[in-house]
Amino acid sequence: MSQPGFACAVPEADLRSTIRRVVAAVVLILLAVTPVLAKAKPPFVAEIVSSAADQVTGGDARLHIVVPRITPLQQVEVLVNGVNQADRFTPIAGTETLTGVIDGLVLGENTVVVKQHGNGNGLPEPAILTLTNHPITGPVFSGPHQNPFMCSIQNYGLGQPLVDNPTEGFPVYEVDPYGNPTDVIIGYSMNCSADTLVTYLYQDTDGNFKPYVPGDPRPADMAQTTTMDGLTVDYIVRWERGTINRFLYSIAMLAPFDEGPDDLDTSAWNGKVIYHFQGGVAIGHYQGGPSTSRMLYETGLSRGYAVLYSTGNKTGTHYNLVLGGETALMVKERFVELYDLPVYTVSLGGSGGGIQQYIYGQNHKGLLDAAIPQYSYPDMVTQAVHVGDCELLEFYMDVLDAGNPRWQTWSNRTLVEGLFASDTVSNPYTGTVGATECVMGWRGLAPLALNPVYGAAPGMELYEPLSAVAAIHWTHFDDIRNYVGIGADGYARNYWDNVGVQYGLSAVASGQITPEEFLQLNAVIGGWKQEPDMVQEGSPFYPGSWDPWSARNQIFSVDPLSAPAPRREGDLDAMQAAYESGLVFRGDIDIPVIDWRHYLEAELDMHNTHQSFASRQRIRDFRGDSDNQLIWFTDALGGAQFDQTPEALEVMDEWMMNILANPELGVAGNKPALAVDRCFDTFGTEMAAGDDVWDGILDTDPPGACTAMFPIYGTSRIVAGGTFK
């Protein structure tokens, strides 16, 4: 009988027979297809190793390509925007991986397809990469360039900058037949670019570097060096310099055998890289002056390390550590394009160079594999907070409360400043003995960071138009304006704040100052003026009346007893931006760290010892432990003497090689015997070592052996009830 929706009914027996036939047919099809599936080739695997895929610069990139074993190498195609560049690739010995550098990338997105020649079925699946290319002048992610920007390469052997426009920037002059600049301007440069320069040097037997031409007869005074791999070679260095991200960069490496600039000799390279950062304090608008001793870091070169450096990674050029991190990534990218991936990259650098290591280790995983920060601080942002208190407090004790005999004993100033003070150190500002770290270490930093009309940059009188130079706001906050933003007054938002700070709180609580002194201090001390209200500094920073405290830019009260002096309120958006942009070290670092410094408290040096432990506390707060960070102090009675850095490099090398050999054990599980907290005497001899030598600083345990020998001090904000970190 017919059923609705069907033309006719199907007998049940016939239906079962039909199902059996269909199932059998499907099984036969699967059996026929299975051998084909089993024989399917593994895919190509392609990886960019010189940078992140979206952070390529300069139009080229190094790739590693894993080729399926059954694919003949001569059939590999590397199509860069459709153009085959397979001839740029060579096998890595002992692997199925090809390495090579592609070029000709256009600005913006580029497509790279790695495949086997042909279009037939059964070929390996291609690898497809999308690479985003940026100019070698930057930026990549740091935001709009800072302008005006004064060039410096003409002072450091790289010639005049390349002309990039006809009307604005740093002038470029016509040269005479002898190569000397004339007075005739042929154009201007805003990017301060230079052609890449490769030269060769040799070290003589007196330890000096001299020019060398590969292939020339061997100089009689040429020294030799033995690398950490035990290879003894002539001390000849290949030295490449140029500009990346508008800053001067340097790559140096031993090259003991004859080579040309494009024929790289890696025979004496130990496979490892030192990235040498540098400190100082500056606020940008300048290409920077390089340090030859860091570019040609003898301890590293002689042992076979490659040494990387950039004026963009010198905080004496600028303190925009987003820009600095970008620059370091770009310089390392250039190195990897030249030489391929290193075994590891370890960083060195003191003061601001130490800050960079903590910040970049946090923000750019993979840039650094190990760090040796020297004389470090956690970051610039939180350091600036208590440093901004220094001159407010010094002016109060020198002038506003000058009649109080307590402050005439200079060591008493530690009670409110937290930083060390001495009754015996000569004070150049008073002509007598007695000084503080605020005076000897930090004087002049407040106007440099805060005063928009105080700063300057070398060569700014040459820049066109001069009206652009006159419009610069010379502050640290304007240096990082891309992140903190611009306020309604037209100035960069400023995070510095002292509203509600109870200066001297722990001192009054412990009875070291009286309640009356505490109340008067907090009523009279004010803060810093808003940027539009600031005026030019006085002597000794600028011609004028004596004002080492920058008091003319402080806020006071006409009658502090009835109306306390107003404080400076920081911008909340700027505070948030400092964290979000990565300018604050939060403790997010997982690489091995040896934090080393000379103990310089008696010198009233700005590199105070509490900073190493501030970083440690942040690491503990973020990670739960600080097993990856070691703290080493070397005594410096009478001034810095023994350099512990070579030993730190040796310990770090053993630590890193353990990690590479046993990655499953992690950073802490691979520590060699000497990778512990330690302290040393002035001759570099170990005084104490172990996990407990710094007890009593970040805990309530009895002082450890090193703690007892090297007292740690605080800051004005710690005295006021703030945290140690």
Predicted regions and their residues:
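N-terminal secretory signal peptides that target proteins for export/translocation
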Residues: 1-19
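Residue-level detector of alpha-helical hydrophobic segments embedded in or interacting with membranes
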Residues: 6, 30, 37-38, 130
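Intrinsic disorder/low-complexity segments in short proteins, especially the signal peptide
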Residues: 11, 33-36
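Bacterial N-terminal signal peptides
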Residues: 22-34
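C-terminal His-loop and adjacent cap/lid subdomain of alpha/beta-hydrolase
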Residues: 39-725
